[in-house]
Amino acid sequence: MPNPTAAMLVIGDEILSGRTRDANMHFLAQELTGHGIDLREVRIVHDDADAIVAALDALRADHDTVVTSGGIGPTHDDITADAVARAFGVAIDVRDDARAILQAHYDRQGTALNAARLRMARIPEGATLIDNPVSAAPGFSIGNVHVMAGVPAVFQAMVASVLPTLTGGEPLLSQTLRVQRGEGDIAGPL
């Protein structure tokens, strides 16, 4: 039986412009491979709701699991949660449990939970929260889609939270051999 498949959707103008280097794909690939899930596709889209919805619809139809990275922060261009809600045809609003997590976090810091920060408590109807032990603002899962932050430390913590809930197959085992020959010399025997 073949292993389950996964896709990754990286969202952000900062990635496509070269201002920020994506560090999450390599990490996710390693984690999924170790869990017996084959990462088959990665797409990077800009901060545009139509582009996010189109990519998400295609990926979730073709793969067992989709992981998104980016676009769930407090700024005006963080539109991933809205796009995911649109893709699933559900409402989105500030959810009490997400708000309580953020309120407790900002109370501990002595910082106000302002309108911008409250945007991070907007969760599509029917989604379950993904724990964020790094900076509190939760990600969420809906259907076969797991929506995570783009900040690498937060992304990694969210992957650690979600991975045990995914059904894996046979992990890929590999070994590296160093050969002091050019590829053209060894291509035939391979």
Predicted feature residues:
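Short beta->alpha linker loops
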Residues: I44-D47, D97, L118, R181
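Glycine- and acidic-residue-enriched helix-capping/strand-helix junction motifs
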Residues: I15-M25
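A C-terminal functional module that forms or caps the active site or interfaces directly
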Residues: G184-L190
